[in-house]
C-alpha cells in the first residue's frame, strides 16, 4: 500500500507547477517496482526493428514522417495579456456574442495553488 501512496504523491507533484523537485519524496523504504519492469532503450529498439522486418507496410507508413518531430505543432504562449482578452471581447461583440469579463480568468486573479503534498 505504501508503494501506491508514493506513486500517487509523485504523480501529484509532477502535475503541480510549483514543485521544483518531483522526486524529492523519500521512497527508500519501498523498493522501486518501476525500475524492475522498465525495459531498456536497446530492447525497445530491437523490438522496433523486428516489427519493421515483419511488417513492410509499417515501414512505408512511417517513412514519410520526419524523424523526431511532433505530429501536432503546438503554440507556446506562456502568458496571455489582457489586450488579448480585449481583442476577444471586441471580436465576440462584433458577432453579436459577448463573453462577459474574460479578465477574470487571468493568472493574477486565479494563481496556482502551491503544492503541499508531502511537505511538513
Swiss-Prot record:
Spell out the Polar residues composition-biased ranges.
29-45
Q: Where is the composition biased (Low complexity)?
A: 74-83
According to the UniProt record, where is the region Disordered? 29-86
Instruction: Report what the protein is called.
Output: Testis-expressed protein 48
Q: Which organism is it from?
A: Homo sapiens
* This protein's encoding gene: TEX48
Amino acid at each position: 500500500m505504501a508503494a501506491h501512496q508514493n506513486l500517487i504523491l509523485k504523480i501529484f507533484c509532477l502535475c503541480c507547477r510549483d514543485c521544483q523537485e518531483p522526486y524529492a519524496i523519500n521512497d527508500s523504504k519501498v523498493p522501486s517496482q518501476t525500475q524492475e519492469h522498465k525495459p531498456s532503450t536497446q530492447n525497445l529498439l530491437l523490438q522496433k526493428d523486428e516489427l519493421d522486418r515483419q511488417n513492410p507496410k509499417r515501414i512505408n507508413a512511417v517513412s514519410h514522417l520526419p524523424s523526431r518531430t511532433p505530429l501536432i505543432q503546438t503554440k507556446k504562449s506562456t502568458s496571455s495579456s489582457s489586450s488579448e482578452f480585449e481583442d476577444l471581447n471586441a471580436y465576440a461583440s462584433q458577432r453579436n456574442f459577448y463573453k462577459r469579463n474574460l479578465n477574470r480568468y487571468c493568472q493574477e486573479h486565479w494563481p496556482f495553488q502551491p503544492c503541499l503534498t508531502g511537505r511538513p
